[in-house]
Regions:
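A residue-level detector for the "anchor" residue at the start of short, highly conserved motifs
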Residues: 10-262
């Protein structure tokens, strides 16, 4: 009797085949997994994580060129350290210290940005320099357009070719014209136009393997003008006593000390 009822039920309510059950389970799984994959992919795209990081350094007295996979070209001044981070939807360079020239290949969907501490430089297809001095950075535009902003400093500031700004946390100077000869550092020529001695020594330190120390801070504002060979920093230091009331003394540890002339 039971067998008859079982057979009747099977005829009225046929069981799906094993293949059909497998397809049905697969369909339900796909309905669950695909949205999760979409949510995950969207989250990754928004977060824009770095999937590749390269560390580059130039030695004292060395200028180093780097060509990126996207066709952009970087030139590191002496004593410079930076990181190139390739993100999913952006390109980012972190300037840790020193100066670099950026010649950027434009990409609409993968913007290029340089970070120097709290200073952010956004590229719009350009050639520009960023010189980081601790918390202070100088951004100089030679061709194209860049936008500069600082953490806690309000809206982005756009530069025109031949302009520069000084930027630090919470502060961004108005754009000002820059001497075109300042671009010659890429060819090993240092152009100083009434530049404070303290700043000159900071630049020369990139090209000199021994510490250069300004013993008397009062001498820091003294102005230096001229065009010098970056690869001959020792000669530049030897010339300073001829144009300024200073003297250069070599200490027992080999460091060079500038002090007021006796």
């Amino acid at each position: 009797m039971l067998d008859q009822h079982r057979d009747a039920l099977k005829e009225r309510f046929p069981m799906p085949s094993a293949d059909a059950l497998q397809r049905r389970r697969g369909g339900r799984a796909a309905k669950i997994v695909l949205p999760l994959l979409l949510i995950t992919a969207t989250g990754v795209f928004i977060a824009d994580p770095a999937w590749q990081v390269h560390d580059y350094r130039s030695a004292v007295g060395e200028r180093r060129g780097i060509r990126l996979p996207d066709g952009s070209h970087l030139l590191l001044d002496a004593g410079t350290h930076l990181q190139v981070r390739r993100h999913i939807r952006s390109r980012q360079v972190v300037l840790v210290q020193g100066q670099a020239r950026f010649q950027v290949q434009h990409s609409t969907w993968r913007p290029f940005e340089v970070e120097a501490g709290a200073v952010h430089v956004r590229n719009y297809g350009t050639v520009f320099d960023v010189d980081r001095q601790g918390n202070l950075s100088e951004v100089t535009l030679w061709r194209g357009e860049v936008g500069v902003r600082v953490d806690g400093g309000g809206a982005e500031q756009r530069l025109k070719p031949g302009q520069r700004v000084l930027a630090q946390p919470g502060s961004l100077s108005p754009p000002e014209a820059v001497d075109p000869d300042r671009a010659d550092w890429t060819r090993g020529r240092l152009q100083f136009d009434r530049m404070p001695l303290a700043e000159v020594l900071r630049i020369l330190q990139r090209y000199h393997d021994r510490p250069i120390v300004l013993d008397d801070p009062v001498l820091g504002p003294l102005q230096v003008s001229g065009v010098f060979d970056a690869d001959r920093a020792e000669t530049v230091l030897a010339l300073l006593p001829e144009i300024l009331p200073v003297q250069v003394h070599t200490a027992s540890d080999g460091s060079l000390h500038l002090r007021a002339r006796d």
